[in-house]
Regions:
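Polytopic alpha-helical membrane-helix bundles and their juxtamembrane interface segments
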Residues: 2-61, 98-100, 106-233
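Long, highly hydrophobic alpha-helical transmembrane signal-anchor segments
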Residues: 50-78
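Alpha-helical transmembrane segments and their helix-entry boundary regions
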Residues: 66-67, 88-90, 181, 203-204
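Short glycine/serine/threonine-biased micro-segments
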Residues: 68, 83, 198
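Hydrophobic, ordered structural segments
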Residues: 72-111
Length: 233
């Protein structure tokens, strides 16, 4: 069963299904037509979503191209998120960029790329990631500490900081290839799925259902690989 699941998870038709899902979601919502401050934010977001999906799929298959794509899409996502109201985007996305670049560097030096089990380093990084996420978002939402968080931005701050913390935890732990890093992406996609159900964004619900399923499958497969192809001492 695990071998069959690995074949399905790493198949090209899953790549195609993922790209079609995220692009279809954006087009179905008409999001690709969005223009803010003269910038084609909708187009940037739609293209970025498709490229990001391929990056996720490559990372799922333990291919280093996924990390390289993550570096590029971090820049695109920072621009899109900033113009959509994330006031801390240019503070937080460089962390994701550095995390993806570090993963690319570390993975390029690993021949086997076998996932590992949890250790103390994993939890230390996760704790630091959440502290950094809340700190950077606080700086961003207070205009670099020039004022308090506006009342209308308070809920946005908490949601953004929490999601950023989960993202940092997943990204900064990816270089060491912990199988359970996918748990962070599972939680992240569950939150995004719930958020879009509340807002009634049916198309985005389909998008995050796919990401959620991919995270579960990747988690199972990485643990399967870890157990069948143990790390060399």
């Amino acid at each position: 069963m695990s071998t069959r699941l690995k074949q399905i998870t790493e198949s090209k038709w899953m790549d195609l299904l993922g790209v079609v899902t995220v692009v279809g979601a954006s087009i179905a919502l008409g999001f690709h037509k969005t223009v803010i401050a003269g910038l084609p934010i909708g187009i940037l977001s739609t293209v970025g979503a498709a490229v990001s999906m391929m990056g996720t799929r490559w990372a799922t298959k333990r291919k280093n191209w996924g990390n390289a794509v993550g570096v590029v899409t971090s820049v695109n996502s920072a621009i899109v998120d900033y113009f959509l109201g994330n006031k801390a985007a240019f503070l937080t996305y460089p962390v994701s960029l550095i995390g993806n670049a570090l993963s690319f560097f570390v993975w390029s030096r690993k021949g086997d790329r076998i996932p590992r089990t949890l250790d103390r380093y994993y939890f230390a990084v996760a704790g630091g990631a959440f502290a950094l996420a809340f700190g950077l978002n606080y700086i961003g939402f207070t205009g670099f500490l020039q004022h308090g968080i506006a009342e209308e931005d308070l809920s946005k701050f908490w949601v953004t900081a929490l999601i950023t913390g989960i993202t940092f935890s997943g990204t900064l732990n990816m270089p060491r290839m912990y199988a359970d890093t996918w748990v962070f992406w599972l939680v992240y996609n569950s939150l995004k799925l719930y958020q879009n159900i509340l807002f009634g964004n049916v198309a985005f619900v389909a998008k995050y259902v796919f990401y959620l399923v991919n995270a579960v499958m990747a988690w199972r497969v990485w643990h399967f690989v870890r157990k069948t192809e143990p790390l060399k001492p």
